[in-house]
Amino acid sequence: LIVLGISSKGIEWVADQLVKVFSGKQIPNLLMLTKGLSIHKNNYELLVDKLQRLLLEKGITKINISAVGGPCLAAGLANRVHSSVVIANKDIKTAKKIADMLNTNYYHTSFSDDLNGVEVSAAIKNIFSMAVGAARGLCSKNISDEVREKNYLNTASALIKQSIHEMEIFVEHLKGKKETVKG
């Protein structure tokens, strides 16, 4: 298993490195930590799909890429703070095998065969979390700061509901399962 924790700008570089090292050989299973979307031929492209496309273009045909999704910050993980993630692969057996391998008493893993749904959700969740985080400032301007401070959760709840709905639409658009958004 090779774990790829690179910036989204490094996808081309890592494809080149994998081709150099594994030219003519089987590439081990890959696990992408990198999140995001790219544009290819005027369409959104998941970074796992981009890496697969680049490797295929370079003649590597046997590629098995998994991805990690979920709220997990490196600093928390380094300090063994309880974290929960999902390992996704189009082959559920591979996803389970990797999830079992990585699971610890503080790094809790589940698994999914909805690679697209997990990747899209992971890539866009922070956009929606920022909107929810802005709820305090977005709630009614017709109330005092004191009342707003105590009652902004109605606005936050409405934003969470709308965010989930929009994530489901986007996930389905990129060929994932909308159920994956809710876990």
Describe every region a protein language model picked out.
Residues 21, 54-64, 82-180:
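Internal alpha-helical scaffold of NAD(P)-dependent oxidoreductase catalytic cores
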Residues 69, 182-183:
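Active-site nucleophile and cofactor-binding loops and adjacent substrate-binding regions
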Residues 2-3, 126:
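N-terminal Rossmann-like NAD(P) cofactor-binding module of classical short-chain dehydrogenase/reductase
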Residues 3-80, 98:
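Rossmann-like NAD(P)(H) cofactor-binding subdomain of soluble oxidoreductases
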